[in-house]
């Protein structure tokens, strides 16, 4: 069998045909990318896996670890009109304990579409069609989550803005969420800060704290430019202190845990969420209207809603995801079975420097996993 890393493999050519049929411009993205956008916006797991280097000017560069960020940066650089659909098919590079560090991804980024529900449904339908074109008989599991419903739940519970931001950053990471909820209940013990730092944190003196942190880093032989800056660390320490001073009623936290435990088929999800909101006097009306509109659009796209699992705890701990998130998985492989993943990232292009808000939704397919699955089923 031809390795999936080859651009001459049958799966590569088959996916090129699928992408060309979906009204998306196939773009070429340079292998060498500025590292900062990935370091600033990617999740902790991806940051650890990036291959970093520098040019002769000392600028941080990396081998392309994924496509969404560079495709969006390319769109901004070209000052391209929207709506616009981009397709990609090429190598990405990530450090792995096992297996090759170079592998292929394919996907579509849909930028600037006015109809959010329709473009969400189209993204899922396109991803599913691409997967089924390569592995038509494989048992698949589709899991869907919604960052905006979780955000609406936090607001309805009356959580302060700081805690909402913290919990949203943990959404989709079960361990991080457990730690955050333990902090919110006051049951998570924190290591005490040295007294000199603790005084500045208690006073909210971000400038003084940053100066002291920088001095300590230099004394320890650590470059202040490596990783988070002293200012960022100071801001995070003060934020943690403010959050630690807030404790929330146990009953409200119990409701949040009940919400995160909701896992039903998509055809029952809106009914389940509306009943949960009504039973607990929670105002989720606006976000549930959008949720229902998307579910209707998914049904109109020809996807059986009963075949999709809505998991209220499923998300991605990245600041730029704003709504839909989904994965298409190999139902026979629970350990490493994610074949494709996608979601809505309406904040990303603004964070990358776009002059105006540009909504976006897209997906990526893991070709190595898909080829392995297709080979097993042949």
Swiss-Prot record:
NCBIfam families: PRK12295.1-1, PRK12295.1-4. It holds the Pfam family tRNA-synt_His. HAMAP family: HisZ (MF_00125). It is found in: Cytoplasm. Required for the first step of histidine biosynthesis. May allow the feedback regulation of ATP phosphoribosyltransferase activity by histidine. The gene is hisZ. Heteromultimer composed of HisG and HisZ subunits. GO terms for cellular component: cytoplasm. One of its GO terms (molecular function) is histidine-tRNA ligase activity. This function is generally fulfilled by the C-terminal part of HisG, which is missing in some bacteria such as this one. Pathway: Amino-acid biosynthesis; L-histidine biosynthesis; L-histidine from 5-phospho-alpha-D-ribose 1-diphosphate: step 1/9. This is ATP phosphoribosyltransferase regulatory subunit. Belongs to the class-II aminoacyl-tRNA synthetase family. HisZ subfamily. InterPro entries: aa-tRNA-synth_II/BPL/LPL (IPR045864), HisRS-like_core (IPR041715), HisRS/HisZ (IPR004516), HisZ (IPR004517). The keyword Protein biosynthesis does not apply.
């Amino acid at each position: 069998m031809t390795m999936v890393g080859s651009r001459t493999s049958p799966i590569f050519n088959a996916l090129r045909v699928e992408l060309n049929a979906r009204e998306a411009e196939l773009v070429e993205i340079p292998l060498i990318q500025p590292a900062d956008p990935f370091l600033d916006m990617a999740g902790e797991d991806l940051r650890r896996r990036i291959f970093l280097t520098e040019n002769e000017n000392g600028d941080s560069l990396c081998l392309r670890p994924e496509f969404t960020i560079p495709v969006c940066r390319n769109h901004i650089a070209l000052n391209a009109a929207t709506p616009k659909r981009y397709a990609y098919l090429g190598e990405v590079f990530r450090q792995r304990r096992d297996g090759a560090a170079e592998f292929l991804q394919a996907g579509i980024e849909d930028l600037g579409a006015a109809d959010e529900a329709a473009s969400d449904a189209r993204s899922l339908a396109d991803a599913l069609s691409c997967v089924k074109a390569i592995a038509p008989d494989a048992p698949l599991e589709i899991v869907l989550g919604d960052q905006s419903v979780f955000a609406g739940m936090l607001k309805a519970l009356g959580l302060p803005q700081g805690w909402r931001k913290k919990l949203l950053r943990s959404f989709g990471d079960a361990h991080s969420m457990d730690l955050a909820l333990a902090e919110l209940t006051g049951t998570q013990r924190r290591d005490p800060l040295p007294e000199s730092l603790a005084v500045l944190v208690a006073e909210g003196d971000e400038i003084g704290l940053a100066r002291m942190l920088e001095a300590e880093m230099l004394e320890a032989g650590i470059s202040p430019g490596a990783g988070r800056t002293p200012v960022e660390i100071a801001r995070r320490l003060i934020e943690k202190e403010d959050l630690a001073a807030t404790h929330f009623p146990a009953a409200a936290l119990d409701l949040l845990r009940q919400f995160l435990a909701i896992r039903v088929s998509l055809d029952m999800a809106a009914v389940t969420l509306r009943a949960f909101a009504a039973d607990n006097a929670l105002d989720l009306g606006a976000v549930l209207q959008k949720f229902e509109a998307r579910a209707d659009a998914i049904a109109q796209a020809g996807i059986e809603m009963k075949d999709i699992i809505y998991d209220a705890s499923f998300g991605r701990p990245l600041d730029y995801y704003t709504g839909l998130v989904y994965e298409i998985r190999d139902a026979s492989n629970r350990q490493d079975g994610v074949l494709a993943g996608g979601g809505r990232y309406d904040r990303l292009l603004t964070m990358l420097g776009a002059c105006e808000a540009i909504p976006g939704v897209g997906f990526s397919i893991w070709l190595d996993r898909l080829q392995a699955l297709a080979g097993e089923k042949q």
